[in-house]
């Protein structure tokens, strides 16, 4: 029986950063170590898993794979408009920590 080892994406990349992309959108940047690492993450990171993690529909996620920079960008609508009374993450910084915990093969 083949065992599958799962690891967290944050352990496999140089850095994951999340930030506002205006008051209505968030962007996550995944900085890979090199081209080999980029190709691995590109193949392992499924957009539907990210959608499930953040509890949004997959069609709402805009994904940009940028091999020349070894970067993957994910953008999606904020769950709340930035600065509204119920906004608990004004700068969108907590999303990186959540994505770092996502398990991949």
Predicted regions and their residues:
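Long, contiguous binding/interaction regions
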Residues: 2-105
């Amino acid at each position: 029986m083949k065992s599958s080892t799962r690891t967290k994406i944050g352990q496999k990349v140089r850095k994951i950063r999340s930030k506002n992309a205006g008051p209505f959108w968030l962007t996550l940047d995944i900085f890979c170590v090199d081209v080999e690492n980029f190709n691995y993450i590109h193949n392992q990171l499924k957009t539907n898993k990210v959608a499930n993690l953040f509890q949004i529909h997959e069609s709402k996620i805009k994904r940009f794979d940028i091999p020349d920079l070894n970067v993957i960008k994910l953008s999606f609508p904020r769950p709340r408009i930035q600065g509204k009374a119920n906004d608990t993450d004004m700068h969108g910084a907590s999303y990186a920590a959540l994505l770092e915990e996502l398990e991949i093969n």
